[in-house]
């Protein structure tokens, strides 16, 4: 099957796979971030009790862990935003795909015209 495909068809198929993997990565990334956020939210509900503790070291460690978790989650969200900007900025993939499809459609129309013309001439 691949032997019969034109270069344009192969390029289009490769670009389609690239877009699909970007979309899948985006979806997985967002689900992971949402899950991490929910876990953090559950832990934060128990933090006030720990912070009320009289044990200074436990208090300090709790605050340190909470701060670290918030930082890591915010970093992941920043990375996610950057990833989405990259995918959006890479809309040239979509533009290229549309151009490829247009060219392919035009080529098929030209092929049909040539076939009709050649039949009339023969």
Swiss-Prot record:
Signal peptide location: none
Domain of life: Viruses
Residue span of motif Nuclear export signal: 10-19, 86-95
Gene Ontology cellular component list: host cell nucleus; virion component
GO BP term (any one): exit of virus from host cell nucleus through nuclear pore
Record field: transmembrane: none
UniProt keyword Transport, yes or no: yes
Compartment(s): Virion; Host nucleus
Keyword list, A-Z: Host nucleus, Host-virus interaction, Transport, Virion
Chief location category: virion
Biological role: Mediates the nuclear export of encapsidated genomic RNAs (ribonucleoproteins, RNPs). Acts as an adapter between viral RNPs complexes and the nuclear export machinery of the cell. Possesses no intrinsic RNA-binding activity, but includes a C-terminal M1-binding domain. This domain is believed to allow recognition of RNPs bound to the protein M1.
Subunit structure: Interacts with protein M1. May interact with host nucleoporin RAB/HRB and exportin XPO1/CRM1.
UniProt similarity note: Belongs to the influenza viruses NEP family.
Name the record gives this protein: Nuclear export protein
Organism whose genome encodes this protein: Influenza B virus (strain B/Lee/1940)
């Amino acid at each position: 099957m691949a032997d019969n495909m034109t270069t344009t068809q192969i390029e289009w198929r490769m670009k389609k796979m690239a877009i699909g993997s970007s979309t899948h990565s985006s979806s997985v990334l967002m689900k992971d971030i949402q899950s991490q956020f929910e876990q953090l939210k559950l832990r934060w509900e128990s933090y006030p009790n720990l912070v009320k503790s009289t044990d200074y070291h436990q208090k300090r460690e709790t605050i340190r862990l909470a701060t670290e978790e918030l930082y890591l989650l915010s970093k992941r969200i920043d990375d996610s935003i950057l990833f989405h900007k990259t995918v959006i900025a890479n809309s040239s993939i979509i533009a290229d795909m549309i151009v490829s499809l247009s060219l392919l459609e035009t080529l098929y129309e030209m092929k049909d015209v040539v076939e009709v013309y050649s039949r009339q001439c023969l």
